Design a protein with these regions (language model features):
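Long, charged, low-complexity, helical-prone intrinsically disordered regions
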Residues: 1-236
Length: 236
C-alpha cells in the first residue's frame, strides 16, 4: 500500500513509512501563517465537516464563486488551497486520483487504523532520510540526501560521520565532483556484473535520478532541462 505526500515532489510513499512523515504534518499545523493567504482555520474546519458528513470529494465537487488565479498553476476555486492546507497538515489524505484531479478523504477515515502509527522521533526521521537515499541512490552526497530540505543537513551530516566512524559507510571520491563529498555502504562497492542497459527506463522528469540536475550531470554527463519550468523563449 502507498500514500501520497511531499518528498522531492508529490510522491507515492510506502504506507509503512507514514510514521516518518507525521512530524512534518504536525509542523505544518503549527505554522498557520504559512497558509494565511488561502483562508482561515475556520474555513478549513467547515470544509472538513462537509467531508466528514458527505464523504470524500474533489475540487470538482465544490461549487463556489471563482476568483482570479494567483499564478498559472493555481485554481480559480478558493477551496483548492484549503484542501491542500488540510492535506499537508495531515487532516486529509488523497484517496483517489484522475490525472491531476485529487479526491480527498479524512486522514484517519482513509487509513482505517486499529491503532494510529506513533510519530517517528527526530533521530528516526534523520536515519530514515539517510537510509532512503542510500537505498535509492547507492552513492550519496549531503545535497542528494537533503534535496530541497536544507534544514535536515546538519543532523544528516552528523549521522553520516557517526556511521563512517563505525565503518558502516565509506567515503567515495567521484571524479569531477570537486569538493562535494560522497558516501556509500561497503556492500555497494563490491564488483557486480554489468546491468542490462535495456532494463533502464526513466519514466518521469520528476524521477529523482533526473530532478537532481547537478547529480545527473555528474554521473550521466547529461544536462537535463525540464522545459515546463522554462519561459517559452528559452525552450528548445
Amino acid at each position: 500500500a502507498v500514500f501520497e505526500y511531499w518528498t522531492h515532489a508529490l510522491s507515492y510513499v510506502p504506507s509503512a513509512d507514514l510514521r516518518y512523515f507525521l512530524p512534518a504534518m504536525k509542523a505544518h499545523r503549527a505554522e498557520p501563517k504559512r497558509w494565511a493567504a488561502v483562508g482561515s482555520r475556520d474555513e478549513t474546519r467547515k470544509l472538513l465537516r462537509r467531508i466528514r458528513k458527505e464523504g470524500a470529494l474533489s475540487i470538482r465537487d465544490i461549487e463556489e464563486e471563482l476568483i482570479e488565479k494567483a499564478h498559472l498553476w493555481a485554481s480559480k476555486k478558493p477551496s483548492k488551497g484549503l484542501l491542500e492546507r488540510a492535506f499537508y497538515d495531515g487532516e486529509l489524505a488523497i484517496s483517489a486520483r484522475a490525472g491531476m484531479v485529487k479526491t480527498y478523504e479524512l486522514f484517519d477515515r482513509h487509513f482505517q487504523w486499529e491503532k494510529k502509527p506513533t510519530p517517528a522521533s527526530e533521530r528516526q526521521v534523520t536515519a530514515y532520510l539517510l537510509d532512503r537515499a542510500l537505498t535509492a541512490q547507492g552513492l550519496v552526497s549531503l545535497d542528494s540526501i537533503c534535496h530541497l530540505d536544507a534544514p535536515s543537513k546538519k543532523a544528516v551530516s552528523e549521522l553520516i560521520a557517526a556511521r563512517v566512524k563505525r565503518k558502516e559507510l565509506v567515503p567515495v571520491a567521484v571524479e569531477g565532483a570537486g569538493k562535494t563529498q560522497h558516501w556509500a555502504s561497503p556492500a555497494v562497492l563490491e564488483p557486480l556484473a554489468a546491468p542490462d542497459e535495456t532494463l533502464i527506463h526513466i519514466l518521469s522528469p520528476f524521477d529523482p535520478l533526473m530532478i537532481q540536475r547537478k547529480r545527473a550531470k555528474l554521473f550521466l554527463d547529461y544536462a537535463h532541462v525540464f522545459e515546463a519550468y522554462l519561459p517559452k523563449e528559452k525552450r528548445v
